[in-house]
Curated annotation (Swiss-Prot):
Residues 40-276 form the Peptidase S1 domain. InterPro entries: Peptidase_S1_PA, Peptidase_S1_PA_chymotrypsin, Peptidase_S1A, Trypsin_dom, TRYPSIN_HIS, TRYPSIN_SER. Pfam families: Trypsin. Glycans are attached at residues 149, 263. It comes from the Eukaryota. GO terms for cellular component: extracellular region. This is Serine protease 48. GO terms for molecular function: serine-type endopeptidase activity. SUPFAM superfamilies: Trypsin-like serine proteases. Its main location: secreted. Its EC number is 3.4.21.-.
Amino acid sequence: MGPAGLKVLLLLFLGAFQGSFTKKKNLQSVCGRPVHTGRIVGGQDAALGRWPWQVSLRFDYTHSCGGSLISDHWVLTAAHCIKKTWYSFLYSVWLGSIDREYSSTGKEYYVSRIAIPDKHRHTEADIALLKLSSRVTFSSVILPICLPNISKQLTVPASCWVTGWGQNQEGHYPSTLQELEVPVISSEACEQLYNPIGVFLPDLERVIKEDMFCAGERQSRKDSCKGDSGGPLSCHIDGVWRLMGVVSWGLECGKDLPGVYTNVTYYQKWISAIISRAPPGWGGDSTHMTSCSLLCYFLWLSWDPPEPLALA
């Protein structure tokens, strides 16, 4: 290769490096900073743009769970929201809207690939990454939320905010996104609530695992519920909103026991590993994925998949 060829390679390398650096820098400058920052009142309709990372995860065009936009290509949700990972072509996400149904401000993106931890069983390792088939365009109503900064010790505030279109106290599913401030409860304190005899039986298996924590108001009966699963527990830390929890499960929404959340910090290394090893065309641009989609679609037409676990 001559000097001209080496020069071209060097320019390509520098361009790729600069693009990667700029993208990372830009993400950190916009994540967790909603344009609309008005006063939040709990247990009511959310304002448009207040939670711009909120996702409506749809299976076969119907809302099934919540989720959180964490970059221009990735969404984080709960693993139990995913019926079958090879059904990725039937999943889409709805962004930029507070309406459960379609609206003029929202935009739909299709899922090209799904990643779930190998150790996921029922409520354990209840976390999933969804790669979108096209890049998300950020706006005043579509922005990512920051992930926890594992390079330094973060102090989780006494209360955070849960959002979603889940079932309310009347048993109805609201059409408008709901927001609720909930107190954060440590894993140990929550374990005593869910497993009161555990203190007398130290060998008894824990209910609240090391990758879980709780949040919710026991007395006021305010909590996340069915339909909120996979949605964010957003905490305001160091001037930005960070995704500290994913709505996972609970028993009888808002009745004496708090909701249980997957601890995002616990899975931060897993998240980084999945995203870093996914090349630009991972999933959506794959010929194998396209041909598989047609086959899977015909299989899906002839088989009714089971409902996902939806305790939260």
